[in-house]
Structure formats: C-alpha cells, structure tokens
A protein has these predicted regions:
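Short acidic-glycine-tyrosine-enriched beta hairpin
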Residues: 79-95
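Short histidine-centered beta-strand/loop micro-motifs
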Residues: 35-36, 46-48, 56-60, 77, ...
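Short hydrophobic/aromatic-rich beta-strand segments that constitute the beta-sheet cores
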Residues: 58, 75, 109-111
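Conserved short histidine dyad/triad with adjacent acidic residue
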Residues: 39-60, 94-95, 117
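Short, conserved beta-strand element in jelly-roll/cupin
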Residues: 60-75
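Short, surface-exposed charged micro-motifs
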Residues: 35, 65, 90, 100
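Ligand-binding loop in jelly-roll beta-barrel domains
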Residues: 95-118
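A short, N-terminal "cap"/entry segment at the start of jelly-roll beta-barrel domains
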Residues: 1-43
Length: 118
C-alpha cells in the first residue's frame, strides 16, 4: 500500500445539510460538507465545511479540530463561557462539549474529527 496525500484544493462535491429542527435556535443555516478523508477504522475524518448564519444546539460525541478560513463563529458552553473566532483561528471542540454554535457571518472551515467507535 502506498498512501497518497489528500489535497483539499481538489474539487469535491459537497453534501448539503442543516441542523435538525429540534436543535435549531435561530436563523435558517445551510451547511455544505465535503469529507475528503476517512481512515480505514472509520474513526478519523477530515474535510471542508461551510455554513450560512444561524444558531443551533450542539453535543459533541467526537473531538474536532477546526481551522476557520472565512467568517465569524461563536461557541458557548452550557455554563455560559463564550468563544468567538474569525478567519485564521484554530480551535478544538472536545468530546462531551455541549452548548451552542452560532455562525455570525457566512463561514468556511477545515476540520479534522476523531470519534471513537465502540
């Protein structure tokens, strides 16, 4: 086996998604996700995600590294702690995080996700 480099600049058709109705708090956010890589164990994923403005509840069953390319987002945990990120920001949302994700301006990010399979 000769593993190849995964180039995120290669065109890839994204999948349109949106938050579940019971998770939505504000707006009508529309997401596009393009998953460029899944490892053989199906526990590690990497790709590109974009969203229009809106706010929804989140409960992370995975750990996610995010690198925001464009736009502004705000994450808030259940205790009320708040983090705002703009272009160029990198951050990790750890497994078990609960709170809200708000897109203030249309945004795009690269993501790398690890989710343990049982």
């Amino acid at each position: 086996m000769n593993p190849q480099i995964i180039d995120f600049s290669s065109p890839l058709q994204g999948e349109a998604t949106k938050p579940a109705a019971d998770m939505l708090i504000a707006g009508d956010p529309r997401h596009t996700v393009a998953n460029y890589f899944t490892d053989p164990s199906q526990q590690f994923f990497a790709g590109h995600w974009s969203s229009s403005p809106g706010k929804w509840r989140i409960r992370y069953s995975e750990s996610e590294f995010c690198c925001l390319i464009t736009g502004r987002v705000v994450l808030q945990n259940l205790a009320g702690d708040r983090w705002e990120f703009g272009p160029g920001a990198g951050f990790v949302v750890p497994v078990g995080f609960e709170g809200t994700w708000e897109v203030i301006e249309d945004c795009t990010k690269f993501y790398a996700i690890f989710e343990t399979r049982t």
